[in-house]
Amino acid sequence: MTNASTESFFNRSLADVDPDIFGAIGKELGRQRHEIELIASENIVSRAVLEAQGSIMTNKYAEGYPGKRYYGGCQFVDIAEELAIERAKKLFGVNFANVQPNSGSQMNQAVFLALLQPGDTFMGLDLNSGGHLTHGSPVNMSGKWFNVVSYGVREGDNLLDMDEVARKAEETKPKLIIAGGTAYSRIWDWKRFREIADSVGAYLMVDMAHIAGLVAGGVHPSPFPHCHVATTTTHKSLRGPRGGVILTNDEDLAKKFNSAVFPGLQGGPLMHIIAAKAVAFGEALQPEFKDYAAQVVKNAKALAETLISGGLDVVSGGTDNHLMLVDLRKKNATGKRAEAALGRAYVTCNKNGIPFDPEKPFVTSGVRLGAPAGTTRGFKEAEFREIGNLIVEVLDGLKVANSDEGNAAVEAAVRGKVVSLTDRFPMYGYMG
């Protein structure tokens, strides 16, 4: 490369180099600014997190762990990883943290690699009751490599059937029990899970990917000291970059998890993401994060109450955390149809199966809604009640139309109201 081409390589903007990608990013920024984000697993990160994630630390390979790398020149990325580790430990009150997992699936796979052998038995929440693919779904590696015993919720009240958990544990003697899920809106009884695990000599793993921000903020009970290991993603309610963390108080287990992550499952860690994790953990350690977590729960409750008042059923009758499953059958709608109609009205959510759902997984009888992203924008209970009424308006219009095309007039009217609402809560103003 000539000096001119080298200078161009280091200094040309994205808009100049790749206008197609620049344009897509600009359109996505517009979508995020003007639409209401209710996907429970999504959130909005700070400028500081974005800057760390987009930093030159992406250039550095750093196989191994701080102070024990297989590459030279790691003295500064070591600072970032050490800060991420120490902040994660402080945030959750634990002795050990591995901040290298690239995703939620990989953090869970690392725990399996450390604690299980192929063919071993473990228990997890059934996908149809609000579990995750990595908790034993037959289409996932976890369901293919291990003998999975699923537990679920009761058909009457849609609450966890802890008697079933105890009975199945006694019958099958699992090596590992997973507590936690992606669509369960009530408080988890970690103590009871640990008692059941101890009764059969099993490890207790808590996947708190969805509720970690609420745990850090003090509005949901911590799984420690009850669990042997907890995993969490760093986005969702924690408001960090996409990635995972493994937490434990057991030094021997910590060594196993470290070996499972590297070299067992991953190679070089993503140092720019780890730097961004450190920033997000630092933000979550600030006093205002507790206010944020408390507001998330208040907002979710306000939304659930509004939807119930509007004639919808919320699975289990309400929520204690950041999310809810909405049963659409009273509005004669499917999750697929409702997701599309709400999307056209600039309200973003995801179709989701409900417990004992008669519909197919790609159709579903419900949608999952969450409050973290809207709360980050500054929405409070009044805004979430307004959002709930807008959702009911769209679904009532959809019921009248009774077609996949929806009710264009109603959706257009709601879309205008959504833009008026989101315009009052701007985001990323520095981006222009």
Swiss-Prot record:
Q: Which Pfam families match?
A: SHMT
Marked site: Plays an important role in substrate specificity: H235
Tell me which cofactor or cofactors this protein depends on: pyridoxal 5'-phosphate
Modified positions (N6-(pyridoxal phosphate)lysine) in chain numbering: K236
- Where is this protein localized, as stated in its record? Cytoplasm
Which controlled-vocabulary keywords does the entry list?
Answer: Amino-acid biosynthesis, Cytoplasm, One-carbon metabolism, Pyridoxal phosphate, Transferase
Which positions bind (6S)-5,6,7,8-tetrahydrofolate? L127, G131, H132, L133
- InterPro entries in the cross-refs: PyrdxlP-dep_Trfase, PyrdxlP-dep_Trfase_major, PyrdxlP-dep_Trfase_small, Ser_HO-MeTrfase, Ser_HO-MeTrfase-like, Ser_HO-MeTrfase_PLP_BS, SHMT-like_dom
Q: Which GO terms describe its molecular function?
A: glycine hydroxymethyltransferase activity; pyridoxal phosphate binding
Catalysed transformations (reactions) = (6R)-5,10-methylene-5,6,7,8-tetrahydrofolate + glycine + H2O = (6S)-5,6,7,8-tetrahydrofolate + L-serine
User: What is this protein's function?
Assistant: Catalyzes the reversible interconversion of serine and glycine with tetrahydrofolate (THF) serving as the one-carbon carrier. This reaction serves as the major source of one-carbon groups required for the biosynthesis of purines, thymidylate, methionine, and other important biomolecules. Also exhibits THF-independent aldolase activity toward beta-hydroxyamino acids, producing glycine and aldehydes, via a retro-aldol mechanism.
The similarity comment for this entry is: Belongs to the SHMT family.
What protein is this chain from? Serine hydroxymethyltransferase
Native organism: Rhizobium johnstonii (strain DSM 114642 / LMG 32736 / 3841) (Rhizobium leguminosarum bv. viciae)
Q: What is the lineage of its organism?
A: Bacteria, Pseudomonadati, Pseudomonadota, Alphaproteobacteria, Hyphomicrobiales
